[in-house]
Amino acid sequence: MLESDRLISSQSIVSEDAMDRAIRPLSLSEYVGQDSVSSQMQIFINAARKRNDPLDHVLIFGPPGLGKTTLANIIAHEMGVNIRQTSGPVIERAGDIAAILTNLQQNDVLFIDEIHRLSPVIEEILYPAMEDYKLDIMIGEGPAARSIKLELPPFTLIGATTRAGLLTSPLRDRFGIVQRLEYYSVDSLTKIVARSAHLLGVPTKPEGAREIALRSRGTPRIANRLLRRVRDYSEVKGNGIITVDMAQQALEMLEVDQHGFDLMDRKLLLAVIEHFNGGPVGIDSIAAAIGEEKGTIEDVLEPFLIQQGFLMRTPRGRIATSKAYQHFGFSAIEQE
C-alpha cells in the first residue's frame, strides 16, 4: 500500500491539484494558522519592498500537506513578483538550472519543492547564484570545455522540504529566512474548511466544518480532501448542506474516525493490543499479523500514531500506549 492510496494521506495527488489551486489563499491576510510564520513574513516582505530589494532566500520545512507551496505563492504575490516553480528531482543537469535562472526577472521568486533531492552538481551551481547572483557553468566536455560566467538579476530562492535534516550544511546556511510549519489546530482547520466550502459553493454549518477538521490530522490538504468527499455524500444522501450529522455519517462510511485514523491505523493498533498484549513486539511480527509490508508500516502507518501518542517505538519493539487502549474502550485491567 502506498501513502497516496489512503484517503487521509497528506501527500499531494495530481488529480486534486487544479481544485487545490482554486481554493489556495493568495495573501497573508487569508493564510489561516501558522501565526508566527505569517507575522514574521509580513515584516520581512514589507521591509524588502520598502528597499526595493529581493526578499532573502527562504527555506520552508515541515510535514507534507501543511501549505509550503501555498506560502511560497503567497510570498511572491505579496512581493508583487512572478514565481517559477520546479522541484529537486526534475533538475537533473546544469543546463536545466541555468535555463531557469537566466529566465528570471528582477526580484522574481524561484520555488524549488523537495529541495533536499537536488544533486550535488546542481547545488554547486546554486551557491554563487544565491550569494552573488552569478552563474558559473561549464560548457562542453573534455579539452573543449570552457567556463561561462553570467550575471543574474537579483532573485529570491524559496526551498521547501519535508526532510530538512537531509539538506547539506552549505545549502542550508545560504537561506537567510528559515520557517517551520507546524500541524494546525482544530480551530484553524475549521476556518480553513469553512473558507474552502464557501469557495466551492458548498453550504456548510460551523459544526459540520469542525467535525471535518477534527478528523483531518492537523493537515489542511487532508481537510480539503475530506470536505470534497463529505460534499459528495451530502449531495446524494442529504440536501447538499454539510451539517455535523451529515459529516459524521459520511466520515463513518469512509472509515475515518474522530482521531483521523483509517482502517489500517486501527488494524495496526488492535494487532499490537490483541495479538501481542500491547507489546513490545517487533516490526516483522506486526507485518505478518496485519498482512502489510514492513516498509509501509514504518513509513506510512507508524509516524502519525507515534506523533499522536498512541504507539511507542522502543529498542525492544512497538508498544501500544494507554491512549490506544482508551481509544478502543479497553479497561485498565485488560491493558495489564
Swiss-Prot record:
Binding of DNA, residues: 313, 318
BP terms from Gene Ontology: DNA recombination; DNA repair
Lineage: Bacteria, Pseudomonadati, Pseudomonadota, Gammaproteobacteria, Legionellales
Domain-related comment: Has 3 domains, the large (RuvB-L) and small ATPase (RuvB-S) domains and the C-terminal head (RuvB-H) domain. The head domain binds DNA, while the ATPase domains jointly bind ATP, ADP or are empty depending on the state of the subunit in the translocation cycle. During a single DNA translocation step the structure of each domain remains the same, but their relative positions change.
Reactions that this protein is recorded to catalyse: ATP + H2O = ADP + phosphate + H(+)
Binding sites annotated in the UniProt record for Mg(2+): 69
Protein name: Holliday junction branch migration complex subunit RuvB
Domain of life according to the entry: Bacteria
Organism: Legionella pneumophila (strain Corby)
Compartment(s): Cytoplasm
The protein's Enzyme Commission number: 3.6.4.-
Region called Large ATPase domain (RuvB-L), residue ranges: 4-184
Keywords per UniProt: ATP-binding, Cytoplasm, DNA damage, DNA recombination, DNA repair, DNA-binding, Hydrolase, Nucleotide-binding
Protein residues bound to ATP: 23-24, 65, 68-70, 131-133, 174, 184, 221
Residue ranges, annotated region (Head domain (RuvB-H)): 258-336
Region (Small ATPAse domain (RuvB-S)): 185-255
The family this protein is said to belong to: Belongs to the RuvB family.
Physiological role: The RuvA-RuvB-RuvC complex processes Holliday junction (HJ) DNA during genetic recombination and DNA repair, while the RuvA-RuvB complex plays an important role in the rescue of blocked DNA replication forks via replication fork reversal (RFR). RuvA specifically binds to HJ cruciform DNA, conferring on it an open structure. The RuvB hexamer acts as an ATP-dependent pump, pulling dsDNA into and through the RuvAB complex. RuvB forms 2 homohexamers on either side of HJ DNA bound by 1 or 2 RuvA tetramers; 4 subunits per hexamer contact DNA at a time.
Broad EC category: hydrolase
A GO-annotated cellular component: Holliday junction resolvase complex
Any one GO molecular-function label of the UniProt entry: ATP hydrolysis activity
Main location: cytoplasm
Subunit comment: Homohexamer. Forms an RuvA(8)-RuvB(12)-Holliday junction (HJ) complex. HJ DNA is sandwiched between 2 RuvA tetramers; dsDNA enters through RuvA and exits via RuvB. An RuvB hexamer assembles on each DNA strand where it exits the tetramer. Each RuvB hexamer is contacted by two RuvA subunits (via domain III) on 2 adjacent RuvB subunits; this complex drives branch migration. In the full resolvosome a probable DNA-RuvA(4)-RuvB(12)-RuvC(2) complex forms which resolves the HJ.
Pfam families: AAA_lid_4 (PF17864), RuvB_C (PF05491), RuvB_N (PF05496)
